[in-house]
Amino acid sequence: MNYKDTLLMPKTDFPMRGGLPNKEPQIQEQWEANNQYQKALEKNKGNQSYILHDGPPYANGNLHMGHALNKIIKDIIVRYKTMQGFYAPYVPGWDTHGLPIEQALTKKGVDRKKMSIAEFREKCKEFALEQIELQKKDFKRLGVRGDFNDPYITLKPEYEAAQIRLFGEMADKGLIYKGKKPVYWSPSSESSLAEAEIEYHDKRSASIYVAFDVKDTKGVVDQDAQFIIWTTTPWTIPSNVAITVHPDLKYGQYNVNGKKYIIAQALSEDVAEALEWDKDAIQLEKEFTGKELEYVEAQHPFLDRISLVINGNHVTTDAGTGCVHTAPGHGEDDYIVGQKYDLPVISPLDDKGVFTEEGGQFEGMFYDKANKAVTDLLTEKDALLKLNFITHSYPHDWRTKKPVIFRATPQWFASINKVRQDILDAIEETDFKVDWGKTRIYNMIRDRGEWVISRQRVWGVPLPVFYAENGDIIMTKETVNHVADLFEEHGSNIWFEREAKDLLPEGFTHPGSPNGTFTKEMDIMDVWFDSGSSHRGVLENRPELSFPADLYFEGSDQYRGWFNSSITTAVATRGQAPYKFLLSHGFVMDGEGKKMSKSLGNVIVPDQVVKQKGADIARLWVSSTDYLADVRISDEILKQTSDVYRKIRNTLRFMLGNINDFNPDTDVIPEAELLEVDRYLLNRLREFTASTIEHYDNFDYLNIYQEVQNFINVELSNFYLDYGKDILYIEEKNAHKRRSMQTVLYQILVDMTKLLAPILVHTAEEVWTHTPHVKEESVHLADMPKVVEVDQALLDKWNQFMALRDDVNRALEVARNNKVIGKSLEAKVVIGNNDNFKAAEFLQQFEDLQQLFIVSQVEVSDSVDNAEAYQHGDIRIDHAVGEKCERCWNYTEELGSVGELEHLCPRCQEVVKTLV
């Protein structure tokens, strides 16, 4: 008789190979057809909500792995919260205004000079919407679930209107003002930039020491003395109006070979070295404090202009001479200190960074080219003491990667000073996963300057400001709200399509416009004001959402970006942060921790991962990272991830195959009647569930990744599933022992599938559709397993048994190497007490030891001859006695000898009798 036909072998249609690139789109189509996002919301309607507010990615270009990391973690969070019973809507968003889209159109050959502003803006809008569709498709392919049919988009009329109203509220509170201040200016973009749009790169610059003759000594210094300043921006010397010294620092007048120089005493050695002075030739003639030098007058080296000596606390002794070249038109500190002394603000550059007529002999020169002309002129005037070149970290435009300058221009500002303390207080009220996140945003708010919110571009939300005939600014509640209403009805393009008077309320008058003539502001708002208004435009405007959000989660660059602009506008208008909890992730690097770049050939993109391996591999990779810091990806890392995935899949498949004839409605064994080993596994499952839920709650996905592997490898593969084959395949179908194990296997399968569902969204769904008798149509509409108290005494007992079992396995391995046995079923294990452990007494508590050890025979006695000493007893491995049963392959001395039951052990004889 062929006994193979009498075995209850695993049966399942669940394929061994994932085939994810082909399978996943089919699963996603089903979700779409079944309207799963809405069903998930409906299921938890009326429950406590959990709002993760999506920081809008920029609507330009293909997705990179940073996008994938961000969106996948957000999806894991929202799916988990949904399965925990929260009403957790997810509204994805896109940021659509700004220079990159203007540049993209220019690259495509669109000439904005050949069309009206409104026409060009319409093309920008079309381009942005096309980009959104491409990115949307790619996000959905990653398995991200959300309201992609109705995302929030910063160019939508209702969003722009909300932004204008928020602006109006800030204006009402006196937080919006116009001023001429030095701001970061990008000649390459021809626009001002906010701090968030600046990045630092190394730049080679001229480093010069310049002498300024004393003009009026004020009775403090000698008439023939000179102040020495140091600068790395020679082109700003034409704008110099002052020399700043620190009031509390000690300064000295030094005689060097007959020349008299004034510098800070603390820097005298550094200056002497830089200017190659002979140390023996240096004499300190006079000493004074910076306060005593205040109002001394110096002469500009080549212009007929006084350079006033003033006091400023920003002067340090870190570098230079302690006498700081001061040009209020080209530096924030210079501007602030200059205001105290009513100094002129000179900034003789145009939008392209070229000197204007005000620049005199430098007119028409690009500022960087003027460096040489200025140093040549200083040499000619005998004012240049030293010229070197240094490489230093310098601010660059984050879009064009070109250097920026400080340039004083009329700009619109949002006041940070007036709300700074309120924002800092709101940060104190916000929860963070890591302390450094709090410190980072706190310090940025504490140290940041006023926020330049105007941009000299056309693709953006216009500033709702009008001017009267006499130049008065018109920015009232009435006018701003009227503009908001117009934008809501027509979109912001109406600003560029209508005259100013047609954008004002009907019949509007102003004393500054006796003729009824008005003009409008042509600057647009900083894109950070756009996205920073999303709490108003989205959280407060959409019925399914609410303010403040439970979570903002973005890349760590957003501490100075979206996190920063959002809390600024929210505190300014609502008096609180827009988020209760702030979480960030690092950047994605290559396998060696290097930045990805085409030139290095180390770029991996989401599209490639999804097409070659599947979205679930990308998602599993995300869960395997310590995302709070920078993370790594490479082909090798993805291969390792695929191996882990394969192990998970095969384990789930094995369990599916072995519950194919199990019906939980009729076959389940009550917990009290389960075999103790099955109760042990049930409690290990509960332990695993509790820690996994805790890790989800704490956003610790790496811990989940590690614990899943540990549970699968240690508890299931290395023990329970291996041990179980002798029961699941061999025992009679309805045997108590078999149904007991199936009861627990079914529970493990269902609970593990749920616990994996937020991460392996497609695979969990595929397992669910192959799991018999599940009630929900989708695992994503099921609830997470409940955390149940474990039987700790039972776990302690079995944990000790598992440690003893490890010793038995070590002994079996030795016996295998010594050719005593081949397979473990050829073994007889003899165990006894030793000084370490009373194994005989301990093992009396357990039944079916031969099955638990996966051997044919076990003998337990107080003492064992010729045994090896192990931590948990003395162990000897013999070859099993008797003959091998042809059905279960266990060795026995009681093989059947007649007819159908020949060569079977007593157990198999009983089972086969029921089948014959």
Swiss-Prot record:
CDD domains recorded: Anticodon_Ia_Ile_BEm, IleRS_core
Chain segments annotated as coiled-coil in the UniProt record: none
GO molecular function, one term: isoleucine-tRNA ligase activity
Cofactors, names only: Zn(2+)
Cystine pairings recorded for this chain: none
Subcellular location: Cytoplasm
Gene3D superfamilies found in the cross-reference section: 1.10.730.20, HUPs, Ile-tRNA synthetase CP2 domain-like
UniProt xrefs under InterPro entries: aa-tRNA-synth_I_CS, aa-tRNA-synth_Ia, Anticodon_Ile_BEm, Ile-tRNA-ligase, Ile-tRNA-ligase_type1, Ile-tRNA_ligase, M/V/L/I-tRNA-synth_anticd-bd, Rossmann-like_a/b/a_fold
Positions of L-isoleucyl-5'-AMP binding: E554
Residues annotated to bind ATP: K598
Cofactor binding notes: Binds 1 zinc ion per subunit.
SUBUNIT field: Monomer.
Entry similarity comment: Belongs to the class-I aminoacyl-tRNA synthetase family. IleS type 1 subfamily.
The name this protein goes by in its record: Isoleucine--tRNA ligase
